[in-house]
A protein has these predicted regions:
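Conserved histidines in hydrophobic membrane contexts and catalytic metal-binding motifs
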Residues: 1-366
Length: 366
């Protein structure tokens, strides 16, 4: 049986290996994007000085609105529990546009823009730099990433079968990476032992990542957890610039702040608000509220703990995929696993080429 799995392992790895390397390395580059950006652009994300009480929300929105072109409006404001973090003000367009404002001075600090490096890494990771066709044609980049990720799952599973040791002693030896017995031994150990150390996280990343590639897979994945997958339209419209009264947003913020100890961030928009918390597990978990835009009265509450599986699964998939479910510890492990995943095809190619070379040298002597 192992002979058959060796062939599967080899002939799936050879055509898809380099693509898997690109997917893994670009994914690793994205793990600490937020931390890198906050380190490089501290002037944007943090206030210069915490001084006195923050200015009213309505005043901050007014200061931001003065800088906006016609047709663009404020659609929401996010306020962190960290007094040193600047407020993030969301805009109606373009999609996901926002600016940061100092809540103590009213200074508009600048517009959020994803760094070109991380934008490239994201597009490489998801679509191999391809773009969705406006006429609805085949999205080849997304397709190739999806197929390669699916093949990677089979490569990992076949690798387990090939590697599985027969004795405890063999198990112990097969998990060692020896660096002082030649290059070939080192690359072999890195491929075999490194793959085993990263196996569980690589499988988790691949199996969750496939939900973004294939609707049929997403439907099946959701069904395993008893959830019906919602069909997306393939695009998202930016929030519309509508007439909004911001006068009661401060009242909503103050009330929700009072109700929720230990919150991470409160986001208020027109008629709704969300509260996120610094917890392990689903990093997209949030409590949701609705309010009367005319007077700020809270009219509805939807707590995350009361939501059914359909309201939780997407956030869990994302949290497992990026490794954020267990905080910094699991993110570091995910980063290392992604790097190891990227090296597996490279070390595999090296070992395969060496094997071909040895066979070619041995052939004339037969």
């Amino acid at each position: 049986m192992k002979k058959a799995f060796r062939k599967i392992h080899l002939w799936l790895s050879v055509p898809f290996g380099l693509i898997i390397t690109v997917i893994c390395f670009s994914g690793a580059a994205l793990v600490f994007e937020d931390e890198v950006m906050e380190l490089c652009r501290r002037d944007l994300y943090y206030v210069e000085k915490v001084s006195g009480a923050p200015l009213p929300v309505e005043y901050l929105i007014e200061k931001v609105s003065e800088t906006l072109p016609d047709g663009v409006a404020v659609t929401g404001i996010s306020i962190s529990s960290d007094a040193e973090r600047a407020c993030r003000v969301s805009l109606s367009k373009p999609r996901r546009a926002s600016v940061y404002v100092d809540q103590y001075t009213g200074e508009v600090k600048g517009r959020y823009e994803r760094a070109p490096f991380f934008l490239t890494m994201f597009r490489l990771h998801r679509w191999l730099l391809d773009s969705m066709k406006p006429d609805g044609g085949i999205f080849w980049g997304k397709m190739v990433v999806g197929v390669s990720t699916l093949m990677f799952v089979f490569v990992l599973i076949s690798g387990i079968v090939i590697w599985w040791p027969r004795t405890k002693k063999a198990l112990k030896n097969s998990l060692k990476i020896v660096a002082d017995k030649g290059r070939l031994r080192f690359w072999h150990d890195l491929h075999v032992a490194g793959g085993m150390y990263a196996l569980v996280l690589l499988l988790a990343m691949a199996l969750t990542g496939l939900t973004w590639s294939f609707p049929w897979y997403r439907a099946g994945f959701y069904k395993v957890f008893g959830v019906e997958a919602k069909q997306g339209t393939g695009h998202h419209d930016a929030p519309q610039a509508t007439a909004t009264s911001y006068a009661c947003w401060q009242q909503v913020y103050e009330e929700l702040k009072e109700r929720n100890d230990g919150y991470k961030q409160i986001t208020v928009s027109n008629g709704s608000a969300t509260i996120s918390f610094e917890r392990f597990g689903n990093q997209r978990a949030s409590d949701r509220y609705t309010f009367n835009p005319s007077n700020g009265e809270i009219t509805g509450t939807a707590l995350y703990k009361d939501a059914d599986a359909s309201g939780k699964i997407r956030g869990w998939i994302y949290s497992v995929h990026v490794g954020s479910w267990g905080g910094m510890f699991t993110r570091v492990l995910t980063f290392i696993a992604a790097l190891l995943g990227g090296t597996l095809p490279l070390t595999g190619y090296y070992l395969w080429i060496r094997r071909i070379g040895r066979k070619a040298k041995a052939a004339p002597n037969r």
